[in-house]
Structures are given as structure tokens and as C-alpha cells.
Amino acid sequence: MDYYETGKYVFVHGWIPCTQWEEGINMFGEKISNYDPLPDWRTGNWDKASWLNGMDCWNKNIRIKDKIILCGHYHSSWGHCFIHKQGIDIPKTYDDINENWHTEPFVDDGIICLDACTVLSGKVNCWKIDKQKKININKENKDD
């Protein structure tokens, strides 16, 4: 299954299919991607879409009108750092894991990114969808 769609939500791993093209290289030597929407995202290339940074795509206007996309794959701290300008992206050392590293869900208009970078944070983000209200649960497993 490539995605699951309800009336209000679309659940994906990375993001919805779109056309990705390289725009250049940033100061860290990383590729800068840009994206163009597809006429019908449902029939696009899901092999590629599964590995996209959904927050980057969302920030570059790859969205679904009147839907909220729940994604993972890429750590939510990226969105907090580079889009919301809060905290750090990824800690360079274990000593950098502190309150400045935001691993809670990245939430904005049309997106909920749940990836907590569990391997480093020890946290798993969950999002309960209720017809009456939304409840965010961020549970840290301190025993394992």
C-alpha cells in the first residue's frame, strides 16, 4: 500500500509523488531539491515519493488542498529547525541531545510529520485522530 486516504487525511511514508529536480548545492555540500506537483499524485512514482523529505516538499508547496498529510521518514527536527526556526536539526554528538533538539511532531497547515529520529531520541511520536479533537502523545521510553 503506497498511501491511505480518508476524508481529511492522507497517510504516507515520505510524501506524495511529485517531480523532483536538483537546484544546486548548499554550503554543506548537500543537494538542494525543488519540486513540482503532479496532475494526479495518486498514480505517481511511489518508490521515489516514499523517500522524500515531506517537510521540504510541503514547504515548497507540494500539498493537497483540503487534506492533512501525515508523514514520517525524515526527522521532524528538520522542520522545526529549518522551517519554524526552532532548535537544531540533528545533534552532532550525544552531548548535543538536549532541549534545543525538538523531536515532537512537526505540525503546520496541511502537514503532520511524526518521525522522532527514534534511534537517537528514544522517543516515538503518535497522533490520535479523533472526530472531536486531536491529541498529541509524545512518549519517551526511558527503560530500554
Residue ranges: model-predicted function:
Residues 18-20, 134, 144:
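Short, surface-exposed beta-strand-loop junctions and turns on beta-sheet-rich folds
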Residues 13-16, 139-144:
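Secondary-structure transition/turn motif
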Residues 1-113, 117-122:
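Acidic, His/Gly-enriched loop-helix segments that form or flank divalent-metal centers
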Residues 7, 128-133:
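Short acidic-glycine loop/turn motifs at beta-strand connectors
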